[in-house]
Amino acid sequence: MKKIHPSAVIEEGAQLGDDVVIEAYAYVGKDTKIGNDVIIKQGARILSDTTIGDHSRVFSYAIVGDIPQDISYKEEQKSGVVIGKNATIREFATINSGTAKGDGFTRIGDNAFIMAYCHIAHDCLLGNSIILANNATLAGHVELGDFTVVGGLTPIHQFVKIGEGCMIAGASALSQDIVPFCLAEGNRASIRSLNLVGIRRRFDKDEVDRLSRAFKTLFRQGDLKENAKNLLENQESENIKKMCHFILETKRGIPVYRGKNNA
């Protein structure tokens, strides 16, 4: 059963799933699609052409789907946001819609946890089970792989790609691509080690050991792309293949830290 506060504004054409709760002074725009068991809390705003998956929570004064902060954007362009299931979007977070430079949509996968005051700009592509801590700021066209964590107060430059299972430390500033399963920190951020906490949660000890050896082979010395090419030969681990292909395909470069690594 839907529960909609009398002061909430629901525009014509909005599609609301079963058991949706919309609290006081919330706004839901036209052509939105709100899944089952979604809660939109007091004062939150869901703008036109936004899709939010089942069992999600949008907290007070978050704004999802407003127009891009891009001076080339024209209002007549098709533009929206697509968010998967089980998302948590905390207070004052902002998620902008996409532009014609992408496919018109900013996209976020399932199980996202987006903390207070985070900003996700136009055309970002975020995978499943990502976490953005308070005040993390993603510029346009940033891509995050599944299971990636971005620490609080960390800005990420436009077009940066962060691979699966990464950890970006809090109060860092990132302007280059980060290889899957790695931890980066600093201003400017560079790769310091494997994200051991993250990979131990997901993989068995044998795979963790293989990834640790691969990290040392890739990053300790020599040319990074040559190391990746050599490591790919007869490689059986799919996760190590992901690391190597990412290195070979990067467009913004990989920030390599040549000091003491912990993996």
Swiss-Prot record:
Its main location: cytoplasm. InterPro entries: Acetyltransf_C, Acetyltransf_C_sf, Hexapep, Hexapep_transf_CS, Lipid_A_LpxA, Trimer_LpxA-like_sf. GO terms for molecular function: acyl-[acyl-carrier-protein]-UDP-N-acetylglucosamine O-acyltransferase activity. Pathway: Glycolipid biosynthesis; lipid IV(A) biosynthesis; lipid IV(A) from (3R)-3-hydroxytetradecanoyl-[acyl-carrier-protein] and UDP-N-acetyl-alpha-D-glucosamine: step 1/6. Keywords: Acyltransferase, Cytoplasm, Lipid A biosynthesis, Lipid biosynthesis, Lipid metabolism, Repeat, Transferase. It comes from the Bacteria. One of its GO terms (cellular component) is membrane. Belongs to the transferase hexapeptide repeat family. LpxA subfamily. Involved in the biosynthesis of lipid A, a phosphorylated glycolipid that anchors the lipopolysaccharide to the outer membrane of the cell. This is Acyl-[acyl-carrier-protein]--UDP-N-acetylglucosamine O-acyltransferase. The gene is lpxA.
